[in-house]
Amino acid sequence: FSYAWMALLQAICRNGDKAEYYLTLFQDVFTGPNGFHLNGDFKQKGVSRYTYRPFTLEANFLAAEAIQHMLIQTEGMAFEVLPAVPASWKGKRLSCFDFRTDNGLQISVMRDDCNHVLVRCQAIYAGEWVFRNLNQTFSLNAGQVKTFSYCA
């Protein structure tokens, strides 16, 4: 669990390079061919003294959450897209679709290789939100859509 937890903590702290490092380590050392988290360093890479192979899935969910926090973060009614993108992802196409946030939005993000970003927000319920990337406040009724476009 440690490496997936560290990836999540680094993503929350907006440190994309470190989040990517821990996700890569988790994938390379603690993930089996079938994608399951193997609790020990069964590949014997030297990062754990435990080398057994019992598997669990909880750390996989942590890793997935770390990736989501690299792409979208919320705090109250505010949100930010691509807050923890590692340097290795810059200048590359990137997209995520219909992420449902805990503040009542369904968000899709598309970034092209020239760093042009398109953000689509659909309200799950009526409310007022702050899009931190552009420091813009907006209101929507349930089902309404707001689109933002900018260069990162």
Protein language model features and the residues they cover:
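Alpha-helical support elements that line or immediately flank enzyme active sites
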Residues: Y3-G16, M70
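Non-catalytic C-terminal accessory modules of carbohydrate-active enzymes
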Residues: D17-A152
